[in-house]
Amino acid sequence: MTRSLAGAFAFATVMPVPSRRAAIAGRGVLTALPVVGLVLGSAAAAVCWLGTRAFGSGSVLAGALTVAVLLLATRGLHIDGLSDTTDALGCYGPAERALAVMRDGRAGPFGVAAVAVTVVIQSVAFSQAGWAAVLVAVAAGRVAVVVACRRGVPAAEGSTLGALVAGTQPLWVAAAWLVAIAGLATLAGERAWQGPLAVVVAVACSVVMVAHCVRRFGGITGDVLGAAVEVTTTVTALGLAIA
C-alpha cells in the first residue's frame, strides 16, 4: 500500500519520489489516487483561503491562483489530457485517425478552447464557492479516474497507460471512494445536499464523457483520464458555486 501511495504521488504530482519506493502505474496506484486528490485539494484550498484573505472574498484572483497552483503541482498533466482529448474528439475519421491526433503534441483549436474555458470556469467557481469546495472538487476529479478505470472499461489500442490501468478497479472500490467524497462534500455547500449532488452529477458527466471516448477511440487512454479529472473538477466546482 505504501508503494502504491508513493506511486500515485509520483504519477500525478511533481512530488519527487524515489523510483525504488514507488509502484508503477497500475491497480494499486489508481486505487490510491483519490488520496493524492485530498492532499492536492488541501493545498489548493489553503491557497484559495489565503487568496480570499489577501484580495477579498469572492475575488477571481484567489480562484486564478488556486488553479495556477494545481497546474504547477500536476505539471499540467490533466489539462493537457483535456486538450488532447478534445482535439481528438473534434477530428473526423476512424478511431486510428483520432488517436493519432490525440498523440500529436500540438494543441489544436478545440483543445485550446477547452483549456481556456476550463481555466476560466474553475477560477471563477473556486473564488465564489470557497476553500472547502476546492478540496472537494479536486478530490472528486481523482475519484472520476477510479470510476473510469472500473472493470469492463477497455484500453484504446496502442495506449501504454490505458493498457496498465483500464479495467483494474473493482466496482466496489469506485463506489466506496464516491461515497466517501460525497460524504465529505456535505460540508462544502450552502446546503447539506448540495455538495453530494454536485459530486454525483460531476462524476456522472465524466462517466458519459468516458463512455463516448470508448465508443470513439475503442477504449481509454491517459489523455482521456486527464480529461475526466478536469471535467469532474469543473462541474463539481460549478455545482458548489451555486448560491
UniProtKB/Swiss-Prot annotation:
Belongs to the CobS family. Joins adenosylcobinamide-GDP and alpha-ribazole to generate adenosylcobalamin (Ado-cobalamin). Also synthesizes adenosylcobalamin 5'-phosphate from adenosylcobinamide-GDP and alpha-ribazole 5'-phosphate. It is a multi-pass membrane protein. This is Adenosylcobinamide-GDP ribazoletransferase. It comes from the Bacteria. It is found in: Cell membrane. Pathway: Cofactor biosynthesis; adenosylcobalamin biosynthesis; adenosylcobalamin from cob(II)yrinate a,c-diamide: step 7/7. It catalyses: alpha-ribazole + adenosylcob(III)inamide-GDP = adenosylcob(III)alamin + GMP + H(+); alpha-ribazole 5'-phosphate + adenosylcob(III)inamide-GDP = adenosylcob(III)alamin 5'-phosphate + GMP + H(+). One of its GO terms (molecular function) is adenosylcobinamide-GDP ribazoletransferase activity. HAMAP family: CobS (MF_00719). One of its GO terms (cellular component) is plasma membrane. Keywords: Cell membrane, Cobalamin biosynthesis, Magnesium, Membrane, Transferase, Transmembrane, Transmembrane helix. Its EC number is 2.7.8.26. InterPro entries: CobS. The keyword Transferase applies. Its main location: membrane. The keyword tRNA processing does not apply. GO terms for biological process: cobalamin biosynthetic process. Its cofactor is Mg(2+). The chain crosses the membrane at residues 29-49, 54-74, 107-127, 129-149, 161-181, 192-212. It comes from Mycolicibacterium gilvum (strain PYR-GCK) (Mycobacterium gilvum (strain PYR-GCK)).
